[in-house]
From Swiss-Prot:
Domain WH1: 1-100
Segments crossing the lipid bilayer: none
Protein's job: Regulatory subunit of serine/threonine-protein phosphatase 4 (PP4).
Biased segments, Acidic residues type: 798-809
Gene Ontology MF terms in the entry: protein phosphatase regulator activity
InterPro entries for the chain: ARM-like (IPR011989), ARM-type_fold (IPR016024), EVH1_PP4R3 (IPR055236), P4R3-like_central_dom (IPR006887), PH-like_dom_sf (IPR011993), PP4R3-like (IPR051137)
Biased segments, Polar residues type: 750-761
Subunit structure: Serine/threonine-protein phosphatase 4 (PP4) occurs in different assemblies of the catalytic and one or more regulatory subunits.
Protein name: Serine/threonine-protein phosphatase 4 regulatory subunit 3
Gene: ppp4r3b
Amino acid sequence: MSDTRRRVKVYTLNEDRQWDDRGTGHVSSTYVERLKGMSLLVRAESDGSLLLESKINPNTAYQKQQDTLIVWSEAENYDLALSFQEKAGCDEIWEKICQVQGKDPSVEVTQDPIDESEEERFEEMPETSNLIDLPTCELSKLEEIADLVTSVLSSPIRREKLALALENEGYIKKLLQLFQTCENLDNTEGLHHLYEIIRGILFLNKAALFEVMFSDECIMDVVGCLEYDPALAQPKRHREFLTKTAKFKEVIPITDSELRQKIHQTYRVQYIQDVILPTPSVFEENFLSTLTSFIFFNKVEIVSMLQEDEKFLSEVFAQLTDEATDDDKRRELVNFFKEFCAFSQTLQPQNRDAFFKTLANLGILPALEIVMGMDDLQVRAAATDIFSYLVEFSPSMVREFVMQEAQQSDDDILLINVVIEQMICDSDPELGGAVQLMGLLRTLIDPENMLATANKTEKSEFLNFFYNHCMHVLTAPLLANTSEDKLEKDAVLGSIKTSTVCPDNYQTAQLLALILELLTFCVEHHTYHIKNYIMNKDLLRRVLILMNSKHTFLALCALRFMRRIIGLKDEFYNRYIIKGNLFEPVINALLDNGTRYNLLNSAIIELFEFIRVEDIKSLTSHIVENFYKALESIEYVQTFKGLKTRYEQEKDRQSQKLSSVPSILRSNRFRRDARALEDDEELWFNEDEEEEGEAVVPPVEKTKTEDDFPEGYEKFLETKKAKELEDKENLPKRTSVGGFKFTFSHSVSAANGANSTNSKSVAAHTPPASSNGSSSKNTSLTTTVASAKGSLIGLVDYPDDEDEEEEEDTSPRKRPRLGS
């Protein structure tokens, strides 16, 4: 019995004026030799460690609040509180404190909280040691009472004495009786005085007075007094709102009357603090600290009582997931959980952990999966709020659930896919819900909060799951708005600029911008998973179609996606960009923007400036060789001239290097087979092909088996010779200005190889042959050649090989026809 009676929680007040839970234990009062006095000791019930050792100081002001709380300050800005499980235990310790200080245990405050200057004045005015004499509680004295209450607020000593006087004489209930009389008599002046009186009593900041004012008997009359603000022409109707508009709904009947009363009281007190009372000035901000604590401890108590009632929570979950539950009832159940989770935010971390683990064990995530798919907007919004609490609490818990779920369910009903679909289908024109859901998804796929243990790595497991089961749902709107059949139609028309697939609908553009933001996050934080996906789906080409959108913010999102990819300085990505000629839509956007100096212009130039500064050789060569003539007229920045300089410097270096190599070695360079990829890249490709059944980089369809590929030196020479003959036959015709015109009509399959199985042919670009039969410089890393049987074969060329090949200065340089 004594254990239960002395069971307490220890709280300290932090810098944000919020109570931090320091642990649960058992309190005792004993003489401590080291401290030379009676002290309060709290030992943890878990391991017996000392949670608190505090000497009962004769001059410290202790307060007893709500029958089960003792609060005091040990030093400046260091407040402590003991929250007792039982009133009897609180009374016992309170008596010990009062005994040490020589006080009557019936008082709620043992000392006046006074500073030195106040104490000096206090000693000079012995008459203040008496309690304040209150005027008789009658109508004619209301003005005098109001003046008294407002006058003491500036003095801590007088506030304390007034609070004691009000408590001892039962004065508040008498005032509230006068309020009823004034309302019956329409005594407006008296009602205005009562507003000042009740507001002033609240600012006394005394828990004992709050207990009276917020009791069932008094609280509505207190609210009534606060309706008659003299500054308002007409009184507010707070009581009408609380009694008629704000309805208390018991989704499951609450049998505990104390719990029900506590819920009512907390709602009404919160309403007083948030709605009725004016925002306190900088001089009044500490006047209501006890009111904040009152609400805080009430919420802690409510959550604890509900959490301990397993029958109640089990019934709530059962009805929430029952198909027979009607929509109205389900809406109420979801709203209850939303409020329940909101209250849980008042708990300390360890208590919040226990709270959410209780919900998880009862099945909160499967329940959310059901309600998030409902048509009711209110239900979905409330479910999203609950989901956000869970993700914030433990992303790992949510990830573990969805991976287990994937073993038993289809992709379309997985929780994460339900969340993605809600994001995509958000009917809000501003996509407020979609933005919230996107943030939650980003938290779930963020490797920074994923765990790595000796037995398993959450990161690799979850990302494998996400890219296999969820990524296609996320990118569906993007791929639908940049669909392949429309791209092919655009290619027939001759220019990607005639594209009709760019969404002009503002809401769709916003959604695509959100999806791109998430994909950009993936590029930054995921490795081979997103690389694999981008190359298999030719995703960057699809994204860059959005550069044509009339919504500049969407074009910038598309550009940002490409910028992040280039920022990785990954040659895999660089080869993909070069082979797909993916700078063309970016340069078209720059040229279309004309002389306008805007964010799009600056962002595009910054991308090319990054390539120049970082000296990304493969991209520099590709840009200069294919686009420089279109860009050389841009002189307001030196970026493009700088790229040309970089290109020429590299070309000179390679020429010098080549001239220093004996001719016999140069000729031998042509007798080697295509080099293998780096081990890790080759391993990655092989793994991917096994898992996905698709090739990643080669820009051709696999129309033949591996047996048809050239084997050994002889076949390699045959295919090389066939390629050179084809080059001579396909030389472009010279234009009147001496240049060459190329129209790039890359299909999706030309960029990503075997991904597009329906394509009958693949567009490939082969450089014109020089006079000596060797291939001219071509920065594309993969070249399409025809074998004797007519099959298309992908060979890997490297820039350094091509740099070493001989070429004549008269060899024409290919240049695309850019859309105007």
